[in-house]
Amino acid sequence: MIFRTKADLDSHPCFNKKASASYGRVHLPVAPHCNIQCNFCNRIYDCANENRPGVTAKVQTPDESVKFLEKLFKFRQDISVIGIAGPGDPMCDADKTLATFEKCKSHFPNALLCLSTNGLALPEHVDEIVRLGVSHVTVTVNAVTPDVGSKVYSWVRYEGKNYYGEEAARILLARQDEGIRKLKEAGMLVKINTVVIPGVNIDHVQSISAKAKQWGADIMNCMAMIPVHDTPFENLKSPSTEEIHRIRRSIGGDIEQMTHCSRCRADACGKLGER
């Protein structure tokens, strides 16, 4: 791994609220495919107007991403982090994701590299992620028991086969557990993202935070589910701001809570709150 000082690592605006006032991030939308189907996601990522995770104006190739960054860094010196978060799952498109990080490591050695994933295809790539100098990884964990997971996920595609129900959730949870443990053993900074879904996992978040603490995760981000058209959860209400605040207060003793998330698009660029 590239040597980083604590000051370097602390300049990630998502992992450090103070840094978000001074530093921004850029997400490179190089990974369009996904290996799980969440019941709150319609997998339609080509959108220029919606401001939520999983959407982008276009998908870039690794080379297009480098050209974009070369132009960006000419007028944005406040971008400290290059991240890959979709619009699908970066580890489902591992070849594109890792090739992009390889190019970024070579062309922009001072930038922090960041990855966001559901964790299903994470374990087998941890060594390569470390080699490429990725320092911050976010894993989205919406359940830590198969019964709850079976309500969140429609299916999981693992080793070329689709799995459903509790079997699917059990596979995903085992892979997340293995991947996160490997990340922490490698010295990575790890954030756990949890989509809070009323009537599904809202009363389960405390169990997720306890597991995150057990993993040694560094910070947790509880995000309100956004109802999306043409999904199984399209008619569910998004949890209120007060409900999210209550959850954060109740689990803050387990693990530090991120309170400044802007639920970034897969092509987000700038400080949090900017597109």
Give the residues covered by each predicted segment.
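Short glycine-enriched, charge-decorated loop/helix-capping segments at active-site entrances
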Residues: 52-57, 153-156, 165-166, 234-238
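Active-site mouth loops of central-metabolism enzymes
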Residues: 54-62, 197-202
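Conserved AdoMet/S-adenosylmethionine-binding subsite of the radical SAM
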Residues: 91-223, 228
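Conserved functional loop/turn residues at catalytic and ligand-binding sites
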Residues: 33, 37, 42, 133, ...
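A structural signal for short coil/turn segments at secondary-structure junctions
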Residues: 76-77, 108, 187, 255
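C-terminal accessory regions of radical SAM enzymes
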Residues: 239-275
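N-terminal [4Fe-4S]-dependent radical SAM core
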Residues: 1-29, 34, 43-59, 71, ...
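Conserved N-terminal glycine/acidic-rich loop preference
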Residues: 6-18, 22, 69-85, 90, ...
